[in-house]
């Protein structure tokens, strides 16, 4: 099914390339190599999934039926090898950012609490200004509130 989808998608891309004469079309070698790589990836994925099913069946059939408690502990120890695709790696990189850190442990100290009245009453704070929306050239930053008092151009 997925091979058929790949072939139809590549035929569609080839047709779009044929209609646009101003762009260079891909050489035949690169298109053939792309098709071959996609088919090989699909076949490899199917083989790995079939092998995992076979390994699980063989693993469960070799255990004796009388050792139910041992079977439960063995099932928890058996973890199939997962193939990490580029999408999973991208998601992993996305959530392992250096800008924030997620933790399950309880912090040793509570964060410091500042009263806003004390902060505003302090005469040393001169740069306190109301927040206002950014007007940036880039669309992704338009309409966001600035988190600092200084202004910078994007």
UniProtKB/Swiss-Prot annotation:
Residues 1-18 form the signal peptide. Residues 19-134 form a propeptide. It comes from the Eukaryota. GO terms for cellular component: axon; dendrite; extracellular space; synaptic vesicle. Keywords: Cleavage on pair of basic residues, Growth factor, Secreted, Signal. GO terms for biological process: cell surface receptor protein tyrosine kinase signaling pathway; modulation of chemical synaptic transmission; negative regulation of neuron apoptotic process; nerve development; nerve growth factor signaling pathway; neuron projection morphogenesis. Pfam families: NTF3_N (PF19338). InterPro entries: Nerve_growth_factor-like, Neurotrophin-3, NTF3_N. One of its GO terms (molecular function) is growth factor activity. It is found in: Secreted. Its main location: secreted. PANTHER family: NERVE GROWTH FACTOR NGF -RELATED (PTHR11589), NEUROTROPHIN-3 (PTHR11589:SF4). Belongs to the NGF-beta family. Seems to promote the survival of visceral and proprioceptive sensory neurons. This is Neurotrophin-3. The lineage of its organism: Eukaryota, Metazoa, Chordata, Craniata, Vertebrata.
